[in-house]
Amino acid sequence: MESRGAGRAIFALAVGGFAIGTTEFVTMGLLPQVAAGTGVDIPTAGHYVSAYAAGVVVGAPIIAVLAAKAPRKTVLVALMVAFAVANVASGFVDTYAPLMVARFISGMPHGAFFGLGSLVAASLVPPHRRTWAVAMILIGLAVANVVGVPLTTLLGQRIGWQVPFWIVGAIGAACVVAMVAWLPHEAVTGEESFRDELRALTRVQVWLALAIGTVGFGGMFSTYAYITPTMTELAGIPLGWIPVVLAIYGLGMVTGMVTAGRVAHLGIMRGIIGSLAAIAVMLAVFGYAAHSPVLAVIFVYILGVLPSILVPLLQTRLMDVAHEGQGLAAALNHSTLNTANALGAWLGSLVLAAGWGYEWPSRVGAMLAVLGLGIAVLSAALGRRTARPRSQAA
């Protein structure tokens, strides 16, 4: 069904990706306002960000397994309804505990939505277009960084911190309407059982793919987590220009997502290995380039491009190696990305606490990318060894 209907269905899913990407990052830009509005200090308000991430990590595997036999269209619609309601609720609470609960619930549909959405999108196009279809859903995240996050942050600062959550809820509602209208029933029926989904966890290649995401993306997050002080302290870019720098990063993400489909034609594992190698080199040089404002901005753009090529490739790889348990594996990919976020930021904080300077988080990131590259090479080698006896037997 690669037609106008497929395009509309993928667009509907991308709208959901845009809503999710906006709510995931907007809280970070409004921490002072949210802290004041809920009567806590800024460090405590950071828990709201952690609550959302925890919801992603916990919700993705649980929902994927429990919803294995349900029609995927029904599950996707239900996930977006829950997401929209939780975001609207986030704007109606003004104390710490209720907002923590609302943000946790808001995060729970995140991984399952992208995981199931990727499977649905891939089912609507020919096999050689699967990575492109997955990238088009994930591009919603990238566009959110360019448009959604800056706009809702501005509105939150000018009108009130609750407004962005209500806007995200409205976008989520629009996504629900679009999915009901445009997602085909026949292409989105889950055929896997509870045991089929869990069986994916017995496959070595699934764990290797998840490890690539955790370690490889940890390198990117170790750099991005400290991008603002890196730009102001090393590159000398004024703080007022940081939103522009972040928008350039978002444009890089869009470029990477669009490019991923073409890279996939070279082979999924070749693309993964090549992307990780490029990420490692880029991060190794990043700390030196950051001392020049022009080079710093160029490298921020590249920091958006290269990992965004890798995400759809990894998602496709998990579909290939999970066999019957594709729903769980695809959802777990987004749990690992949030784990990578925490891992990278933590390792970056260690070198900064040691007084090594803002050049070093990206160098730590380069080491993580090299480790991810090693895991990818191991995965490819094991894949060839497994395929060889089968071909000989045939």
Residue ranges and their predicted role:
Residues 270-314:
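C-terminal transmembrane helical hairpin of 12-TM major facilitator-type secondary transporters
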Residues 39, 71, 92-98, 236, ...:
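Helix-breaking motifs and short loop linkers at transmembrane-helix boundaries and internal kinks
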Residues 60-72, 256-268, 352-353:
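Helix-to-loop junctions at the C-terminal end of transmembrane segments
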Residues 11, 82, 86-89, 97-106, ...:
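Paired small-residue
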Residues 58-97:
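Conserved MFS/SLC helix-loop-helix module at the cytosolic interface between two early adjacent transmembrane helices
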Residues 321-358, 365:
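A late C-terminal transmembrane helix in Major Facilitator Superfamily
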Residues 102-140:
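Cytoplasmic helix-loop-helix junction between adjacent transmembrane helices
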Residues 169-189, 375-379:
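C-terminal membrane-cytosol helix-exit motif in multi-pass small-molecule transporters
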